[in-house]
Regions:
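Short, glycine/acidic-enriched loop or turn micro-motifs at the edges of active sites
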Residues: 33, 92-96, 104, 179, ...
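Short hydrophobic/aromatic-enriched beta-strand-loop microsegments
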Residues: 48-55, 106-111, 149-157
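Phosphate-binding and adjacent anionic-ligand microenvironments
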Residues: 86, 123-201, 205
Length: 210
C-alpha cells in the first residue's frame, strides 16, 4: 500500500506540471527496460498522448541494454515507422531524457535545454534569464542564449554541481548535454519524464519550432 501511495503521489506531481492535456500527440516511448517502464506510459496516456512503447519489459538484466538514451537507433527507426510526432528516450533510472523529432533526428541535452530556457524566458519564468550548464556544453548553446537575451552559468561536470548552483542562486533551469535536466520549480534532480512532458507541451503549442 505504501508503494502505491508513493507511485500515486509521483503520478499526481508529474501530471500537475502539465497545465493542459497533450491530446493528439503521438509519442514513441523508449523506457530502457528500466524504472519508467510501467509508469511513463500510464502518465502520458492520462495526458491524452497516443503512446507506442518500446523496451518496456524489464527483467533485472536487460536495463539499458542496447536501448534508452545512450542507444537511440531503435527509437529513431520506430518514430519514422509509426509516423510519431516525437520519440522520447529515458535511461534506466529515468533521470535522463533525450528526444527524437518526427524525422528521426535526435536532439541532445543542449538543444533541449535551449528550447526549455527560451520558453521560460518567454513566460518570464527563467530567473535572471540564466541557464545553468556544465563546462561540457557546446559554445553554440551559450551563443544562442546570448542572442535571445539570456546567459549561461557554467559548473563542473555532474548534475550535482548544476543543482548546487541552482540552489545557491535560485535559478530555474539547469542541466547537462547528456540529458539530465533540472526544473527547479518541480524537482531537485533530473526527471526524464518531466523533461519529456515539458518539451511535449512546447511542441503542441509551437509545432513548427525546431
Amino acid at each position: 500500500q505504501r508503494q502505491m501511495c508513493i507511485r500515486d503521489r509521483y503520478i499526481d506531481h508529474v501530471i500537475a506540471a502539465a497545465p493542459c492535456k497533450l491530446n493528439g500527440l503521438k509519442v514513441v516511448m523508449d523506457c530502457s527496460n528500466g524504472a519508467n517502464s510501467v509508469i511513463a506510459p500510464v502518465i502520458l496516456r492520462s495526458l491524452g498522448v497516443e503512446v507506442v512503447t518500446i523496451f518496456n519489459q524489464p527483467n533485472g538484466i536487460n536495463i539499458n541494454n542496447g536501448c534508452g538514451s545512450t542507444h537511440l537507433e531503435a527509437l529513431q527507426a520506430k518514430v519514422v515507422e509509426v509516423g510519431a510526432d516525437v520519440g522520447i528516450a529515458n535511461d534506466g533510472d529515468a533521470d535522463r531524457c533525450l528526444v527524437v523529432d518526427e524525422k528521426g533526428e535526435a536532439l541532445d541535452g543542449d538543444q533541449m535545454m535551449l528550447i526549455c530556457a527560451l520558453e521560460l524566458m518567454k513566460k518570464k519564468q527563467l530567473k535572471d534569464n540564466v541557464l545553468v550548464t556544465t563546462v561540457m556544453s557546446n559554445v553554440g548553446l551559450h551563443q544562442a542564449m546570448k542572442k535571445y537575451g539570456g546567459s549561461c552559468v557554467k559548473t563542473a561536470v555532474g548534475d550535482r554541481y548544476v543543482l548546487e548552483e541552482m540552489l545557491k542562486n535560485g535559478y530555474s533551469l539547469g542541466g547537462e548535454q547528456s540529458g539530465h535536466i533540472i526544473f527547479g520549480k518541480y524537482a531537485n534532480t533530473g526527471d526524464g519524464l518531466l523533461t519529456a512532458i515539458k518539451l511535449s507541451l512546447i511542441h503542441i503549442s509551437e509545432p513548427t519550432r525546431p
